[in-house]
Amino acid sequence: MTKKIYIFDTTLRDGEQTPKVSLNINDKITIAKQLQKLSVDVIEAGFPKASHGDFEAVKAIAESIQGPVIVGLARASKEDIDCAWEALKGSLKPRIHIFLATSDIHMEHKLKMKPEEVLKRAADMVRYAKGLCPSIEFSPEDATRTRPEFLYKVLEAVIEAGADVVNIPDTVGYTTPVEYGAFIRGIKENVKNIEDAIISVHCHNDLGLAVANSLAAIESGAEQVECAINGLGERAGNAALEEIVMAISTRADSFNCHTDIVTEEITKTSSIVSHVTGMQVQGNKAIVGANAFAHESGIHQHGVLNCRETYEIMTPESVGLKKNFIVLGKHSGRHAFVEHLHEMGYKDLSVEKTDEIFKKFKELADKKKHISDEDIESLVKNEIFHVPEVFKLKYYQVFTGNTVVSTSTVEIECNGKKLSEASCGDGPVDATFKAIEKATGIDVTLNDYFIKAVGSGKDAMGEVTVRIEKEGKIFSAKGISTDIVEASGIAFINAVNKLYYETYSKDLQKISAN
């Protein structure tokens, strides 16, 4: 039997630190449920002490997700550890993840502490946390720039104090595969009680080496890999879960290890995370990019048609890309549609959500002759991540051209009242956004706007993503339609609804249509 590598997913914690990404509690629970289906071993649900929202999200995930270990991050302080335990104690498999910097530059300039103080603090806080929680992980922040002799002392001390996992982060993405592999071997050879703990690794992608470094660490004896879906994370991101897992699976002959990941759930998981975060997956991204299994070269196409193994080292089906054997259109019935949803992996949708998605499908089928899986995927995701509609876009009309100022008139429904406004703008989309702002009485900043085609051909849908900001908080949302202006208006309204939902979710009656 080959060695098992534990997959520690940090999409909900480190992944959420991606610039311009902000997840609400429902987003996090939805992603956590999908990670459960993916069969990750560990879910780092958040940093409970960071905010009330993070605390509530970790608590909700701890109480609702079974199977994976649920982790809460904490600084090396009793206050942080107490907060993390309060959020985690409802989990069947809780773990507190304590971090404390150990590099000279961090100790001197950030912590203002001497090495002996850091050593004592690390051991004391692990010992304290172990008195609360059955599983403790410790991370010496900036480990790869820490003096090895000091790092060995810290690791030995925290393991003796009760740490079950010691995580070795390449915090600034500075190391290389050869260096990192040697670094892990040095730990195994010089920390006398290292066999009493699992060695974990956490690599950042600043030099584009996060996955390579993680794999080098596995070859050198690491047993747990911290990673994120689509490689999300601060700066250039974290090691991509899908790439690590499929490298281990595809090159089992080289790594001589395995994971328990259900690889057929990878594509769906990537798609859900992309939708929720608003972070598009680049087309040539390994494993989950739109072109990952595309062959344009005639020579490559000929080879694949004759024998897939000529140019494909893994099958699309192995990561959840399934061929569509049912053609859906405006004459398709609910039964065939539901069967197709099941084929796509959506087997646990409620009757209400299924009915709403089918309704949207029939509306789309009246506009499009050919319905693709991408179209259906967009409809499903928009319904899954739907928040209560305080504001509804009932009607819009634009007047535009290259010699006139674009004007948009919108009608918004709020609490049964109809609000109509018109506005001018720099193009029909800008005019529509301004009209919606006037009608809803909001004042937000548009941070991002981008669009992509869903499907192909002249009747392809447009999927618009917008990010708005209010009082330092960012809200992202999507809209889909065969009409770009309509898709844009829907996305903007959805973002506004998300803003109001998160602001007034405990008392939606506060919303008025003044």
Curated annotation (Swiss-Prot):
Record keyword Amino-acid biosynthesis present: yes
All residue ranges annotated as the Pyruvate carboxyltransferase domain in the record: 5-267
Regulatory domain, as annotated region: 392-514
Compartment annotation: Cytoplasm
InterPro entries referenced in this protein's UniProt entry, alphabetically: 2-IPM_HCS-like (IPR050073), 2-isopropylmalate_synth_dimer (IPR013709), AIPM/Hcit_synth_CS (IPR002034), Aldolase_TIM (IPR013785), LeuA/HCS_post-cat (IPR054691), LeuA_allosteric_dom_sf (IPR036230), LeuA_bact_synth (IPR005671), PYR_CT (IPR000891)
Enzyme Commission code(s) on record: 2.3.3.13
Binding, Mn(2+): D14, H202, H204, N238
One GO BP: L-leucine biosynthetic process
GO molecular function annotations of the record: 2-isopropylmalate synthase activity; acetyl-CoA C-acetyltransferase activity; manganese ion binding
Major location (coarse): cytoplasm
A Pfam family annotated for this UniProt entry: LeuA_dimer
Cofactor: Mn(2+)
Catalytic activity: 3-methyl-2-oxobutanoate + acetyl-CoA + H2O = (2S)-2-isopropylmalate + CoA + H(+)
One Gene Ontology cellular component annotation held by this UniProt entry: cytoplasm
Pathways per UniProt: Amino-acid biosynthesis; L-leucine biosynthesis; L-leucine from 3-methyl-2-oxobutanoate: step 1/4
Keywords tagged on the record: Amino-acid biosynthesis, Branched-chain amino acid biosynthesis, Cytoplasm, Leucine biosynthesis, Manganese, Metal-binding, Transferase
The keyword ATP-binding belongs to this UniProt entry's keyword annotation: no
Protein family: Belongs to the alpha-IPM synthase/homocitrate synthase family. LeuA type 1 subfamily.
Assembly and interaction partners: Homodimer.
Function: Catalyzes the condensation of the acetyl group of acetyl-CoA with 3-methyl-2-oxobutanoate (2-ketoisovalerate) to form 3-carboxy-3-hydroxy-4-methylpentanoate (2-isopropylmalate).
Protein name: 2-isopropylmalate synthase
Organism from which the protein derives: Clostridium kluyveri (strain ATCC 8527 / DSM 555 / NBRC 12016 / NCIMB 10680 / K1)
The organism's taxonomic lineage, starting at the top: Bacteria, Bacillati, Bacillota, Clostridia, Eubacteriales
